[in-house]
């Protein structure tokens, strides 16, 4: 008979047999795959993905995503990674480095039969959020047939939602900052079982910007792991490799022997243009290339915002977008998506978009500001000419930057050709920018911040052969932005300290006199009413009254004119600090001691007190002199009057009522006059012992007296009870108080302890509460009885006893 659940046992059990066969077949395929990987020759050049020893889910994902042919970096790196070796991979931009580490991640975890119960198996670190999103999208396409759980952990999203899902992830793609936050704050997130660590754009992650963060992350990870590093400009520093605990890494540099570090189909040019003409040349370029897809790189986010807002108002005829690190994550993602799908557009961006991002069909890469080094240049131009496509790049250089930058590019095998701008095609937009800044104070403020951020980006660079802020025409550059004058730049010290020190004193004295004269003229009324004032003069003199008024006021001179670059104004700028001393106090100043009276109010020049001053003595060493209204206010402040009051003394009083100090000490001479110290000690001990004995006797006598009184009260109560029994009267309970029988006065005090009941009966009924009290004293549950004889009393006592 078959079981209740309908299943069969014995030789006809087909489902169980089929399950065993399937598990056996999967295990055989896994063993075969492991053997193929072990037999793989890393020196062999593999061109097709079908020739690699890959699992069925990975092969199906590659075929569905239309990946068929391997690139050079993929052919050389995947073989070493499948065997579990650490890799340092360096290849040109757009050469397919992402698949070179994603395929080994999927395969190594698949061969180990990784599941959600095993925890985190692979961690991929990316320097930017956009690159992390791009890596995650490729992982989703290639690993769609695997059963692994993958997650994206970047800033700008809800931390709590990420914490809830983090414990179930097998593969994580993240940015360093958010990953460290989870390692420190998410309690159930464990990384002790990590198998692979991947650093994309490793040179950027390992530099000074992420050094502390990456060191902290590595401190949470196990040392026994496989580490893969990929970048277009790879690091070989021993210190960096030691931090990552690399074990005999394999250096895979595909294009190390190539003649150029950039893609072969990339056309690279540079234009020497003065700093004040950069925006004019950029505008002319955009107007002449409306049917192109262009990325324009600038050095700071404030420059990106200003150029985007100003060009957007002028409407060049092509869609404009901007991308920088201060934008919210949702906005950044929308912009990257729109620019990727756009056919013709211009994207103004910082170096956030310089690494790893794959924007399809980018025609031009314009570097409006000089990159900080040759590696940054390589990554910027790598946004075009990807995957063997054509691309063009143009670098804008100031004459002071040309020689040093070309030297750095030659050291990195980067060859750039110089081109000239046709003067007849160049358009000037200086007047348009001035008009917009005049009408829009917010755009004017944005231009001032853009100017300061550019100057700061040049000032902080270490390579002074390229970046020398003293050789830049900053005043003319401010005018090209539409600003009425160059904003203050407090971090630029102007001339050297040695030059200022050797300058003649007369020059500094005259400049200080001129400044004081100018300040005096400000206080006077305007006398030059007949002078003609144009609308531009009024524009420069007006003050903003909107939300940006305070910020705008900090960026210009107090008179609204442009900042002059002479020594006097530079010294004045140095004195105009964020914190200024309102009043300086010296040691011994009476204002500081007493609370703020001026020296003129206190004393005359000869040190005598003023006439009519009042002197108040408050039992202190110093008398209070009241010679001004400010001093008179001291009388209302108890805290400030404490200085003029003497210190209080604590007194005790003896039995006779005489006051004594708390501690009355004898002089040394008086003490010696009384005799030897040991004799005085023995005498004192004897006196104290006698005093203690007498006090003990008195206490014992008091205790005996209390005990005697208590005994007498108890006997008096017993005698009273016996007398009542002999008389045969009613038994009345006498109130008992601790220590003896209660007196008549005690009874009177005890009786009104309960509130008298309010009764509406007649007066006769109000006189009957006394016998009721006697009845209440009887035991509960028994009716009161009249005791007439001794037998009745004995029977009542027997009943009470039991």
Swiss-Prot record:
Residues 9-24, 705-714 have a biased composition (Basic residues). A motif (Q motif) lies at residues 47-75. A motif (DEAD box) lies at residues 200-203. GO terms for molecular function: ATP binding; ATP hydrolysis activity; identical protein binding; RNA binding; RNA helicase activity. It is an enzyme of class 3 (hydrolase). Pfam families: CTE_SPB4, DEAD, Helicase_C. It catalyses: ATP + H2O = ADP + phosphate + H(+). ATP binds at residues 91-98. One of its GO terms (cellular component) is nucleolus. Belongs to the DEAD box helicase family. DDX10/DBP4 subfamily. This is ATP-dependent RNA helicase dbp4.
């Amino acid at each position: 008979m078959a079981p209740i659940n309908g299943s069969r046992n014995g030789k006809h059990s087909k489902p169980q047999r089929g399950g065993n066969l399937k598990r056996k077949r999967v295990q055989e395929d896994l063993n075969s795959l492991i053997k193929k990987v072990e037999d793989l020759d890393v020196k062999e050049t593999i061109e097709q993905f079908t020739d690699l020893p890959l699992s069925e889910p990975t092969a199906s994902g590659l075929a569905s995503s239309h990946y068929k042919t391997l690139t050079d970096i993929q052919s050389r790196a995947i073989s070493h990674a499948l065997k579990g070796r650490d890799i340092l991979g360096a290849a040109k931009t757009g050469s397919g480095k992402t698949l070179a580490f994603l395929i080994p991640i999927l395969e190594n975890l698949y061969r180990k039969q990784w599941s959600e119960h095993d925890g985190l198996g692979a961690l991929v670190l990316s320097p930017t959020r956009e690159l992390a999103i791009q890596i995650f999208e490729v992982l989703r396409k290639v690993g769609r047939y695997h059963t692994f759980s993958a997650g994206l952990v970047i800033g700008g999203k809800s931390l709590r939602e990420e914490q809830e899902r983090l414990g179930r992830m097998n593969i994580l793609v993240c940015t360093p900052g958010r990953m460290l936050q989870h390692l420190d704050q998410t309690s159930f997130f464990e990384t002790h079982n990590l198998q692979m660590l991947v650093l994309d754009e490793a040179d950027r992650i390992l530099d000074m910007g992420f050094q502390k963060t990456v060191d902290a992350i590595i401190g949470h990870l196990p040392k026994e792991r496989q580490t893969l590093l990929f970048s277009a400009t790879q690091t070989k520093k021993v210190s960096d490799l030691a931090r990552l605990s690399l074990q005999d890494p394999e250096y895979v540099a595909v294009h190390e022997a190539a003649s150029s570090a950039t893609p072969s189909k990339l056309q690279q040019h540079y234009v020497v243009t003065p700093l004040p003409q950069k925006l004019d040349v950029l505008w002319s370029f955009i107007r002449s290339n409306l049917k192109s897809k262009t990325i324009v790189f600038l050095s700071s986010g404030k420059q990106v915002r200003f150029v985007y807002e100003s060009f957007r108002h002028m409407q060049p005829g092509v869609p404009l977008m901007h991308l920088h690190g201060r934008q919210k994550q949702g906005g950044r993602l929308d912009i990257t998506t729109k620019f990727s799908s756009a056919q013709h557009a211009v994207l103004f961006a910082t170096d956030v978009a310089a690494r790893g991002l794959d924007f399809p069909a980018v025609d031009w890469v314009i570097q409006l500001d000089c990159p900080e080094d040759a590696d940054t240049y390589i990554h910027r131009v790598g946004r075009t000419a990807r995957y063997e496509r054509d691309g063009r790049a143009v670098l804008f250089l100031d004459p002071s930057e040309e020689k040093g930058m070309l030297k750095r590019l030659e050291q990195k095998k980067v060859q750039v050709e110089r081109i000239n701008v046709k003067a007849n095609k160049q358009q000037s937009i200086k007047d348009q920018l001035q008009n917009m800044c005049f009408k829009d104070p917010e755009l004017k403020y944005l231009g001032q911040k853009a100017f300061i951020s550019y100057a700061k980006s040049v000032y902080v660079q270490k390579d002074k052969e390229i970046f020398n802020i003293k050789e830049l025409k900053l005043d003319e550059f401010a005018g090209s932005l539409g600003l009425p004058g160059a904003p203050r730049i407090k971090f630029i010290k102007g001339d050297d300290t040695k030059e200022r020190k050797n300058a003649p004193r007369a020059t500094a004295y005259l400049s200080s006199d001129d400044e004081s004269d100018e300040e005096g003229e400000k206080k006077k009324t305007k006398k030059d009413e007949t002078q003609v004032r144009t609308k531009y003069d009024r524009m420069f003199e007006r003050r903003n009254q909107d939300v940006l008024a305070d910020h705008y006021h900090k960026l210009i001179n107090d008179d609204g004119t442009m900042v002059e670059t002479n020594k006097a104004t530079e010294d004045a700028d140095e004195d105009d600090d964020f914190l200024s001393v309102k009043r300086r106090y010296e040691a011994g100043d009476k204002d500081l001691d007493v609370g703020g009276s001026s020296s003129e109010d206190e004393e005359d020049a000869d040190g005598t007190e003023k006439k009519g001053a009042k002197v108040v003595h408050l039992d202190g060493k110093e008398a209070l002199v009241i010679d001004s209204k400010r001093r008179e206010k001291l009388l209302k402040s108890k805290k400030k009057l404490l200085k003029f009051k003497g210190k209080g003394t604590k007194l005790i009083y003896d039995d006779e009522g005489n006051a004594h100090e708390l501690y009355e000490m004898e002089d040394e001479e008086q003490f010696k006059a009384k005799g030897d110290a040991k004799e005085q000690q023995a005498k004192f001990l004897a006196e104290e012992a006698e005093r203690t004995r007498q006090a003990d006797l008195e206490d014992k006598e008091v205790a005996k007296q209390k005990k005697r009184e208590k005994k007498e009260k108890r006997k008096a109560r017993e005698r009273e009870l016996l007398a009542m029994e002999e008389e045969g009267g009613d038994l009345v309970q006498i109130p008992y108080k601790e220590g003896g029988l209660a007196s008549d006065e005690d009874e009177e005090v005890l009786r009104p302890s309960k509130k008298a009941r309010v009764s509406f009966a007649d007066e006769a009924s109000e006189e009957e509460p006394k016998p009721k009290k006697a009845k209440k004293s009887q035991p509960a549950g028994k009716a009161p009885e009249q005791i007439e004889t001794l037998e009745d009393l004995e029977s009542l006592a027997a009943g009470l006893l039991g």
